[in-house]
């Protein structure tokens, strides 16, 4: 917790709730008759409502992207290193919006919410949601806030997929798209990782087919194992080696199945901590949304054809040691955009952190992001004049 709020922090922020009572048709064929989205804003919306930036979160992210909820907070929002006065996403220039997506477990309508038609928690009956559904709901939030066009939409990993979908679905509603450490669709290996994660949850005897709250239970073992698996894929081999190597907790082998290597202790801690803040049904939903995303399926697998609908400029960023969403996956998008005749910039950043590098304030990464968004801000100033 900070003794004093840093000068480059957005400070103490209060989440807001947007209630929607117009039904939202979902890709799965079901609909939500009503729902709510929790969100935070940083900075000030200008008179023409032209300086807004939307932040789209990754699998385990939420609406709390920057600042603090209270002075007692142990840490700031998940992307505080990038959002704030004078930072890469400069709140002196932009009005920044971050939300928790539908199906989430941090305040937006999801499996832990009450189904208004039954008066009971949704739990396993909450419908499958997709990236397309999220973007539709985000557009409704923009309407509510009086924002017709975003200056930029920014997202990393699964968040980057949402940005890509925005450029296709609502091409006139964003001027710039920033897609970081993402992909045009999941690889077979990534789908496999997600299935192992889901099976670890489903096979936990405390899962109760997704209705664990009604059974006064939580599938902590399964969810913790899913997080441990995911965490390994978010880090590079070099990063794990540098952090832990073969460090042990004892002077010699114990010849049992307890914790011996420091990396084992770390993974167990990460898994256990995750179960205290995240919902297993939400984790299942988020991984399915990842699996289903494939915009090129609309155009017989031709990514450049579907991206021809986009009208914004693009910035793509990848990281050299990211093997979950490798640089080659970003380059697929870049090449498709070039083929479609779109304006695109691309930066491959040297980084040791693996996929999680998109969350770190790596100097060249922050410079690339800041330079691109400064150009966006300057263009806004010129247009206002």
Curated annotation (Swiss-Prot):
Pathway: Amino-acid biosynthesis; L-methionine biosynthesis via de novo pathway; O-succinyl-L-homoserine from L-homoserine: step 1/1. Signal peptide: none annotated. The active site is at 157 (nucleophile), 322, 355. SUPFAM superfamilies: alpha/beta-Hydrolases. It catalyses: L-homoserine + succinyl-CoA = O-succinyl-L-homoserine + CoA. Keywords: Acyltransferase, Amino-acid biosynthesis, Cytoplasm, Methionine biosynthesis, Transferase. Residues 51-359 form the AB hydrolase-1 domain. NCBIfam families: homoserO_Ac_trn, PRK00175.1. This is Homoserine O-succinyltransferase.
């Amino acid at each position: 917790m900070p003794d004093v709020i840093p000068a480059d922090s957005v400070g103490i922020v209060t989440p807001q709730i947007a209630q929607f009572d117009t039904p939202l048709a979902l890709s799965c064929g079901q609909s939500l008759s009503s729902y709510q989205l929790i969100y935070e804003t940083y900075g000030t919306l200008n008179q023409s409502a032209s300086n807004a930036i939307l932040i789209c979160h990754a699998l385990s992210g939420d609406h709390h992207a920057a600042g603090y909820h209270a002075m007692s907070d142990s840490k700031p929002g998940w992307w505080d290193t990038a959002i704030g006065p004078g930072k890469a996403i400069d709140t002196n220039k932009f009005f920044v919006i971050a939300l928790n997506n539908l199906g989430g477990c941090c305040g937006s309508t999801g499996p832990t919410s009450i189904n208004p038609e039954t008066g009971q928690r949704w739990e396993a009956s909450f419908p499958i949601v997709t990236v397309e559904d999220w973007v539709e709901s985000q557009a409704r939030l923009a309407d509510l806030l009086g924002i017709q066009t975003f200056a930029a939409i920014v997202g990393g990993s699964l968040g980057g997929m949402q940005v890509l979908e925005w450029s296709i679905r609502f091409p006139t509603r964003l001027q710039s798209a920033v897609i970081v450490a993402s992909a045009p669709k999941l690889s077979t290996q990534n789908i496999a990782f997600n299935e192992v994660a889901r099976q670890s949850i489903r096979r936990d005897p405390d899962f109760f087919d997704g209705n664990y709250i009604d059974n006064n239970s939580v599938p902590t073992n399964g969810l913790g194992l899913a997080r441990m698996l995911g965490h390994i894929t978010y880090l590079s081999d070099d990063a794990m080696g540098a952090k832990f190597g073969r460090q042990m907790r004892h002077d010699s082998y114990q010849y049992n199945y307890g914790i011996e290597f420091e990396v084992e202790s770390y993974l167990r801690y990460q898994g256990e901590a995750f179960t205290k803040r995240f919902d297993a049904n939400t984790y299942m939903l988020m991984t399915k949304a990842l699996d289903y995303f494939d915009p090129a399926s609309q155009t017989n697998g031709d990514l450049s054809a579907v991206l021809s609908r986009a009208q914004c400029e693009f910035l793509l960023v990848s990281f050299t040691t990211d093997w979950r969403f490798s640089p080659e996956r970003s380059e697929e998008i870049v090449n498709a955009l070039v083929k479609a005749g779109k304006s695109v910039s691309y930066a491959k950043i040297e980084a040791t952190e693996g996929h999680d590098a998109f969350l770190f304030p790596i100097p060249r990464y922050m410079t690339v992001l800041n330079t691109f968004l400064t150009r966006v801000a300057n263009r806004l100033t010129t247009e206002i004049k």
